[in-house]
């Protein structure tokens, strides 16, 4: 009986050591959860905002990074950029690049994007801007028109990419 209790205590101690806090090289933060088969960590470019969050900018799981949808918010002001669709689309792609960088990846490693447009009439403009950022071997992509986006954004993009280096 004592051996069983000791074994259970040992397993409890081992399992409680699975999560740990780490910082990325670029000053972003990451929270890791280690297991025998994969590593999962949250990614925030720069310091994470204070208070509770309902989503993370990105999650790294193994060798993949999954980003949340990025909209045209200027990270310095937390305001939507001015200048219409084109300005928002450029900011979205800059924000996406920053999140990928914090995760140890970059635009060249993107495998798949999902683009959400508030108005499908912006599709051709989006393609022109998108092409400037994904020059060679563009990723697989889906584009969907939606009724409304957060903060009345006109475009949102999420991505799945390979991690080039592990920032643990």
Feature map (PLM): residue ranges:
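Bacterial N-terminal signal peptides
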Residues: 7-15
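N-terminal presequence-like segments and the immediate start of the first folded domain
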Residues: 5, 17-94, 98-108, 117-168
């Amino acid at each position: 009986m004592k051996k069983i209790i000791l074994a259970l205590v040992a397993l409890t101690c081992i399992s409680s050591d699975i999560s740990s806090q780490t910082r990325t090289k670029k000053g972003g933060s990451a929270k890791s959860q280690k297991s025998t088969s994969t590593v999962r960590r949250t990614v925030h470019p720069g310091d994470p905002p204070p208070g509770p969050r309902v989503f993370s900018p990105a999650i790294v799981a193994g060798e993949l990074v999954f980003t949340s949808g990025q909209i045209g918010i200027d990270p310095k002001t937390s305001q939507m950029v001015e200048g219409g669709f084109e300005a928002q689309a450029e900011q979205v792609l800059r924000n996406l690049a920053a999140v990928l960088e914090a995760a140890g990846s970059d635009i060249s490693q993107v495998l798949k994007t999902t683009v959400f447009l508030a108005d499908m009439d912006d599709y051709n403009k989006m393609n022109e801007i998108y092409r400037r950022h994904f020059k060679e071997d563009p990723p697989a992509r889906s584009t969907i028109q939606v009724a409304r986006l957060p903060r009345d954004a006109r475009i949102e993009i999420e991505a799945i990419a390979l991690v080039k280096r592990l920032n643990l």
